[in-house]
């Protein structure tokens, strides 16, 4: 396999789901891939900024920066394995993750993004890891699939009794009142209590 064929093969598979899962629109497929690449770049950049916070003797920010940089490298390896052509195993790992369902990738990205935010709360960790979390949220939406058509949703609502068109309608006008509750009486004057 030539170098050009290898690059073409790495770039030609934006989130193909071989298991035949829910079909996502093209803009979500390519948008999630682009968002993942941008998120990985900023996570690495801001992770380096957090690592440089060792000057202020903040060990938790140092560890959070290292975790954020590792998360950025993992996301970059899974979203754009063409960036790691020199490492042979990256392509096979990316293929294995692409074979998994979308919710696996969504959970992985969200789980990797949370620890740096809690360890060192700041703009660098919030923005860098927040973009990775947003990528995981987009993959989660893709895993849920498309919404049903309006006619399908109406039919499901009528079958379940929701939506106001229930099959068992009542003619009693007090059907919504709680049992043993008395209605308000407006016939007499309000009695006063003189024992106050």
From Swiss-Prot:
UniProt keyword Transmembrane helix, yes or no: yes
Transmembrane segments: 35-55, 70-92, 113-133
InterPro entries: TVP18/Ca-channel_flower (IPR019365)
Record's subcellular location: Cell membrane; Cytoplasmic vesicle, Secretory vesicle, Synaptic vesicle membrane; Presynaptic cell membrane; Endosome
One GO cellular component, as annotated: synaptic vesicle membrane
Pfam families reported in the protein's UniProt record: Cg6151-P
Site feature (Calcium ion selectivity) residues: 79
Any one GO MF annotation of this record: identical protein binding
Listed GO biological process terms: bulk synaptic vesicle endocytosis; cell competition in a multicellular organism; clathrin-dependent synaptic vesicle endocytosis; photoreceptor cell differentiation; positive regulation of neuron apoptotic process; positive regulation of presynaptic cytosolic calcium concentration; synaptic vesicle endocytosis
Keywords, ordered alphabetically: Calcium, Calcium channel, Calcium transport, Cell membrane, Cell projection, Cytoplasmic vesicle, Endocytosis, Endosome, Ion channel, Ion transport, Membrane, Synapse, Transmembrane, Transmembrane helix, Transport
Activity regulation note: Channel activity is inhibited by La(3+), which reduces Ca(2+) influx and thus inhibits it's function in promoting activity-dependent bulk endocytosis (ADBE) in response to high stimuli.
Membrane topology: Multi-pass membrane protein
Main function: Transmembrane protein which mediates synaptic endocytosis, fitness-based cell culling, neuronal culling, morphogen gradient scaling, and calcium transport. Regulates synaptic endocytosis and hence couples exo- with endocytosis. Controls two major modes of synaptic vesicle (SV) endocytosis in the synaptic boutons of neuromuscular junctions (NMJs); Ca(2+) channel-independent Clathrin-mediated endocytosis (CME) in response to mild stimulation, and Ca(2+) channel-dependent activity-dependent bulk endocytosis (ADBE) in response to strong stimulation.
Family: Belongs to the calcium channel flower family.
Subunit structure comment from the entry: Homomultimer. Associates with the dally/ magu complex.
Protein name: Calcium channel flower
Organism: Drosophila grimshawi (Hawaiian fruit fly)
Name of the gene: flower
